[in-house]
């Protein structure tokens, strides 16, 4: 009796496979003998080509009109969302032209961002660093500090520190991090000795960047913390980022002048690695997320991360792993990395 059931089940599975194969062949036959399969969907095909051109030539989009180029580069990975839409529409339209055209932006997207989707992180590392924009209006600064301390980081950079809340962070982090320095609205906490802590002028008129020397068993490391000005999207002005861009240039100049060979930059740069306006910084440093990250590493907004505007960049240091930490009460996710010195 059991043999009969197994045979019937096997035969049923085989029949189902034959039916599926027959349906696929039927669809292919209809497409093959449809004289309009190459004529339909020209608008979809044109959309796919335009999408591909937008990704390839994004650097040519001018910033003179509302910083449109930087806005496009900030959300560049999300252009890939349109690829499956075009593919589905091409199938529904029964357009071979549109299907083939949709492969073009798909290949380009994979070339640009396919490597970021995979986990490139490794084991080990000499130093774990964390950066977090804690949000000036954070309703639970003490809880945020405890979570950051619980991450196991050796060095912690905090941005958007409200002056009245600095003592709260200092008390909550004191047991884990005996060395720290706060300059303006940014601060650095370390398990290792710190020296030469000072503000960095990024042309704002107040302090939102600093540097310090952290001495670890492998030697001295220059650690920079920066919070570049926010950008705004306005209906009458587009993507306003002039102040951010000027500050990025100043920060890049400060890093060029740095005398130590090992440099780590932690902070909220209010821009992605694709944003040309941050070239003064990104052209001389490596992103830990790009080199050794787990996924895209989107950090903002915390409720539904869509882009990575918080960065850990290094020079003379080898990234081992990079990732985002669980959310706190901030509107940004904390980001972390392990590096070899």
For each of these PLM feature ranges, what is it?
Residues 100-146, 150, 197:
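N-terminal signal-anchor transmembrane helix
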Residues 32-35, 49-52, 109, 135, ...:
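Short acidic/polar alpha-helix capping motifs at helix-coil junctions
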Residues 128-130, 157, 265:
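Residue-level marker for buried hydrophobic side chains located in beta-strands
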Residues 88-96:
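Structural signal for the C-terminal ends of transmembrane alpha-helices
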Residues 135-149, 160-341:
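Soluble catalytic domains of enzymes that build or remodel membrane lipids, polysaccharides, and related
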Residues 69, 98-100:
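Hydrophobic alpha-helical transmembrane segments
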Residues 3-88, 213, 256-258, 271-341:
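Metal-dependent phosphoester-hydrolase catalytic domains
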């Amino acid at each position: 009796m059991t043999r009969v059931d197994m045979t019937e089940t096997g035969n049923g599975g085989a029949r189902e496979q034959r039916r599926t194969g027959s349906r696929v062949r039927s669809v292919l036959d209809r497409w093959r003998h449809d004289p309009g399969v190459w004529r339909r969907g020209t608008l979809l095909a044109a959309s796919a080509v335009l999408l591909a051109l937008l990704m390839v030539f994004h650097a040519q989009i001018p910033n003179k009109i509302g910083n449109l180029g930087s806005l496009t580069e900030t959300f560049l990975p999300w252009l890939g969302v349109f690829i499956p839409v075009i593919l589905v529409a091409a199938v529904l339209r029964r357009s071979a032209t549109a299907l083939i055209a949709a492969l073009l932006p798909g290949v380009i997207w994979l070339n640009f961002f396919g490597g970021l989707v995979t986990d490139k992180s490794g084991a080990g590392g000499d130093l774990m660093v964390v950066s977090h924009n804690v949000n000036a209006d954070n309703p639970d600064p003490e809880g945020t500090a405890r979570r950051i301390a619980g991450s196991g980081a050796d060095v912690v950079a905090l941005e958007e520190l409200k002056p009245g809340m600095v003592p709260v962070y200092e008390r909550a982090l004191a047991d884990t991090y005996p060395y720290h320095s706060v300059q303006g609205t940014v601060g650095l906490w370390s398990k290792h000795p710190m020296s030469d802590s000072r503000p960095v002028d990024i042309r704002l008129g107040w302090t939102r960047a600093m540097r310090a020397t952290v001495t670890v068993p492998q030697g001295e490391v220059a650690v920079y913390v920066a919070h570049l000005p926010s950008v705004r999207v306005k209906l009458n002005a587009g993507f306003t980022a002039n102040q951010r861009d000027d500050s990025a240039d100043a920060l890049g100049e400060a890093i060029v002048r740095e005398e130590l060979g090992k440099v780590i930059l932690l902070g909220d740069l209010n821009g992605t690695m694709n944003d040309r306006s941050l070239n003064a910084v990104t052209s001389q440093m490596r992103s830990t997320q790009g080199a050794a990250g787990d996924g895209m590493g989107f950090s903002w907004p915390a409720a539904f991360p869509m882009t990575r505007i918080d960065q850990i960049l290094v020079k003379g240091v080898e990234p081992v792993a990079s990732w985002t930490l669980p959310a706190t009460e901030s509107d940004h996710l904390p980001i972390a990395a392990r590096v070899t010195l």
